[in-house]
Amino acid sequence: MAGKTLYDKLWDDHVVTQRDDGSCLLYIDRHLLHEVTSPQAFEGLQLAGRQPWRLSANVATPDHNVPTSKKERDQGIAGIEDDTSRIQVQTLDDNCKAFNIVEFGINDIRQGIVHVVGPEQGLTLPGMTVVCGDSHTATHGAFGCLAHGIGTSEVEHVLATQCLVQKKSKNMLVRVDGVLGKGVTPKDVVLAIIGKIGTAGGTGYAIEFGGQVFRDMSIEGRMTVCNMAIEAGARVGMVAVDEKTIEYVKGRSYAPKGEQWDQAVAYWNTLHSDDDAVFDAVVELNGTEIEPQVSWGTSPEMVIPVSKAVPTLEQAKDDVQRNDWTRAYQYMGLNAGQALADIQLDRVFIGSCTNSRIEDIRAAAEVVKGRKVAPSIKQAMIVPGSGLVKQQAEKEGLDKIFLEAGFEWREPGCSMCLAMNADKLQPGEHCASTSNRNFEGRQGNGGRTHLVSPAMAAAAAIAGHFVDVRSF
């Protein structure tokens, strides 16, 4: 009998019952909530007269709609100018109080982007099933978790039953061996993967990321990669547990202590695919060949190394891709064969659940130190992923590096990743962004998004256009 993959092990450990149609009822260990996908779920509980099944499994924080300017933030919820955004944040606050759910509120130092806060607090632990009403919940798979996003009706179901009906995915292994070169980051790795397999390449699969590159990668780097599994078409992305995982979790607020810690570690050390496990699909990349990446179009798969030019229609593989590229040229205001360095940038955004952790901010600061934002850049902003990340960065003096260079140093939140708060692009503006999505209008109506790493974004802010960070 063949061995099990990590995904198989996590799935089997959480099956409550198998249904006649082949789907399974899974037990959910951790449920993270935010203000956008939870209001109707809480209303459903109220109308049915139900209470959350296991209060301690649920933790909430507002992130999508919160303002990141200090002036607005100091006013708390009342400082949110947009009525809909303010109502959503207030409703989360009210619901958490009504149901006695722990919430890291808008002015709590622990508040932040839910996918930064969960691991930071030790709410995310190896071996857990983790769900949240947000597609980038795959982030938590970096800890050897089975983590994925859910819809609002499923949020209600988890609140009420602590279980969820799911159909099992197939197994895919993405193996990246070799050693990353100078200036090549986890963000470049995942963009290169998406560039290779496309945004539908992982559809129907749970992706395990393996190989030397991921073994060498930090936990925060693994979070960046797993975060974008959804952009590769998969709901689930994960990395096996190792000593780095255990060391990261140790001592965090919600991590087990004493004898419970020892028992947990013994289990966590089993969370890897068996040597004889069989995957349904295997994708391989040579990490040594990966360069810093820049997305040029309106899909994460429209990505190229910084050394390349915008592709021409002759390079498209079929008519569908030719049509997609033609529309992307028009929307992005680019020409086939245009050099990336010729794209005039308007704004730079360093933040989001993909790249707003302390390592990301350090990487950007290393590039920025002693330099100035180019006069042609209208706005360059750093948005830490949580209050604690912001606090740590300020302790290290990183905020001063950015402020002296001409960056804005913001309060934590989702910010310019998506057009649901005050941080938006104007029509026609090009933005070097460390976020995860670049479809039409993602950062604001008519806004043009280019996905890059924090180091590449920082270099672009200084140069005023894309430049190979390896030359800095």
Swiss-Prot record:
A Pfam family reported for this protein in Swiss-Prot or TrEMBL: Aconitase
GO biological process annotation, one example: L-leucine biosynthetic process
CC cofactor: [4Fe-4S] cluster
Domain of life: Bacteria
Record key words, sorted: 4Fe-4S, Amino-acid biosynthesis, Branched-chain amino acid biosynthesis, Iron, Iron-sulfur, Leucine biosynthesis, Lyase, Metal-binding
Residues reported to bind [4Fe-4S] cluster: 353, 414, 417
Keyword Iron-sulfur: yes
Enzyme class: lyase
Signal peptide range in chain numbering: none
Comment on bound cofactor: Binds 1 [4Fe-4S] cluster per subunit.
Entry similarity comment: Belongs to the aconitase/IPM isomerase family. LeuC type 1 subfamily.
Role according to the record: Catalyzes the isomerization between 2-isopropylmalate and 3-isopropylmalate, via the formation of 2-isopropylmaleate.
Entries under PANTHER family matching the protein: 3-ISOPROPYLMALATE DEHYDRATASE, HOMOACONITASE, MITOCHONDRIAL-RELATED
This protein's name: 3-isopropylmalate dehydratase large subunit
Organism: Acinetobacter baumannii (strain ATCC 17978 / DSM 105126 / CIP 53.77 / LMG 1025 / NCDC KC755 / 5377)
Gene: leuC
